A protein has these predicted regions:
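Conserved hydrolase catalytic core segment
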Residues: 1-27
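Acidic catalytic loop of the alpha/beta-hydrolase fold
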Residues: 106-110, 138-139
Length: 161
């Protein structure tokens, strides 16, 4: 979503935009979020770090354990989402660069109906929407990573033609 905000504001500096795990719901309006004081800075837990791995058999337990171990060491504080009302600026019609929309089939954050609306509202005809079969929100680390990489490179090659 940050990439989309940057693309909308500075399209002259962006060649194309890839959206993956895109959670925005069509016509959803974030309430004004003007927090006061310091963010809560809650610690990241092992359960939270592993929460994106939803589909059995798409990644080994050893890989999940290593991901969790490194996540806890590299980022011990959980993300504090603040000023979320700024996402109300997001509008597919304001994206003028080519877009690759990647959706994992079982990503609980990325809803097909919302993606359909987003894709329809993109004004640039240089756009592709790829659904990664048998994948969830962590597809770039799972068995679907090859398809994710192939879709990304195919999109880049397609733009060069």
């Amino acid at each position: 979503m940050i990439g989309q905000l940057v693309t909308q504001q500075y399209p002259q500096h962006i060649a194309s935009l890839t959206l993956f795990g895109y959670p925005l719901k069509h016509n959803f309006v974030y309430p004004e979020d003007l927090p006061t004081g310091q963010p809560p800075r809650k610690p990241t837990t092992a359960k939270a770090a592993a929460s994106d791995f939803l589909l059995p058999g798409t990644i080994s337990q050893k890989a999940i354990d290593e991901y969790v171990r490194h996540s806890l060491r590299a980022d011990p504080i959980r993300m504090d989402w603040r000023y979320t009302h700024e996402y109300n600026q997001l509008a597919a019609a304001n994206i003028s660069v080519p877009v690759l929309l990647l959706q994992a089939e079982f990503d609980p954050l990325a809803k097909t109906a919302s993606h359909a609306q987003l894709f329809t509202n993109l004004q640039n005809a240089h756009k592709q929407w790829v659904v990664l079969k048998n994948a969830d929100h962590a597809a770039l680390l799972e068995s679907a990573r090859g398809r994710l990489i192939s879709a990304s490179t195919a999109f880049y090659d397609w733009l060069q033609r």
